[in-house]
Amino acid sequence: MTAILERRESENLWGRFCNWITSTENRLYIGWFGVLMIPTLLTATSVFIIAFIAAPPVDIDGIREPVSGSLLYGNNIISGAIIPTSAAIGLHFYPIWEAASVDEWLYNGGPYELIVLHFLLGVACYMGREWELSFRLGMRPWIAVAYSAPVAAATAVFLIYPIGQGSFSDGMPLGISGTFNFMIVFQAEHNILMHPFHMLGVAGVFGGSLFSAMHGSLVTSSLIRETTENESANEGYRFGQEEETYNIVAAHGYFGRLIFQYASFNNSRSLHFFLAAWPVVGIWFTALGISTMAFNLNGFNFNQSVVDSQGRVINTWADIINRANLGMEVMHERNAHNFPLDLAAVEAPSING
């Protein structure tokens, strides 16, 4: 009898815990994905803050030339970063207990791998939590689908690219200047600006900004007057009101006359789907492009391939980009390479005349 009562009490305790985890009445929804999301994101955030402030220099290239990234070692907010794990570690799983000492772990950039892996788990769980809350509330699942775009982008630069290149040292540093360095080196080695998927991503981000500004300005310009001149227009809306707060017919008419009739949406639902889908699809393509370039399927390189009928080279901007790529490749990791890979692969010119 005692055993049965204890089992019921434990079942009741577990049941109450399950109900609390999945309750939509909590001020912040936790969910089963949140059970994993909370500790992983807290770990990533805590280690990031500590390492950004106080981590010692890291031997990123594996050539015994440590690079400083923290504030206490001479950096500021702009130049500081979490330096990627050393090339000497490569793709090895490198938790603290795999190092001979904490000093060795810090020298080899262990915090970067710890932060990145916890962060990727955390944001993936955040996406799952979005779906979970939508499911509990009877909503459609597109919020999580939209969030999959930045998750895919982060996964591409922090995980897929290092896997393709063979080392976490090739991952994106966690800092402002480090991000710019990553972008420049990526262009030098993969010609990303000439990759169609990156072009689609640019169209997605810039187009999304344009469409967002157009939509916001159109709605704001066609509000239904509910206030006097002496009141803020925002006072004319009450949260939860059933009637429309702006005149979509007026907005449609304005935009249709500004450009042409069929450039303007006459359906609010299809309009908002378009506003969500455009940048999401663009960022999906960019993440896919990074993931293919990770394995050296690079952007277009015309390499003086535009010629006239006599076979003479017609110089184009693409050739200027190639020249810039070589310059950037020469300058990065100066002490790790004698020659940039593109130049080293070419036969030495004859000097015998």
UniProtKB/Swiss-Prot annotation:
Superkingdom as given in the UniProt entry: Eukaryota
UniProt site positions, description: Tyrosine radical intermediate: Y161
Protein residues bound to [CaMn4O5] cluster: D170, E189, H332, E333, D342, A344
Proregion residues excised on maturation: 345-353
Residue numbers binding Fe cation: H215, H272
Ligand binding (chlorophyll a ChlzD1): H118
Site feature: Cleavage: A344, A345
Membrane-crossing segments per the record: 29-46, 118-133, 142-156, 197-218, 274-288
Positions that bind chlorophyll a PD1: H198
Keywords for this protein: Acetylation, Calcium, Chlorophyll, Chloroplast, Chromophore, Electron transport, Herbicide resistance, Iron, Magnesium, Manganese, Membrane, Metal-binding, Oxidoreductase, Phosphoprotein, Photosynthesis, Photosystem II, Plastid, Thylakoid, Transmembrane, Transmembrane helix, Transport
More details: 2 of the reaction center chlorophylls (ChlD1 and ChlD2) are entirely coordinated by water.
Subunit text: PSII is composed of 1 copy each of membrane proteins PsbA, PsbB, PsbC, PsbD, PsbE, PsbF, PsbH, PsbI, PsbJ, PsbK, PsbL, PsbM, PsbT, PsbX, PsbY, PsbZ, Psb30/Ycf12, at least 3 peripheral proteins of the oxygen-evolving complex and a large number of cofactors. It forms dimeric complexes.
Protein name (Swiss-Prot/TrEMBL): Photosystem II protein D1
Native source species: Lotus japonicus (Lotus corniculatus var. japonicus)
Gene for this chain: psbA
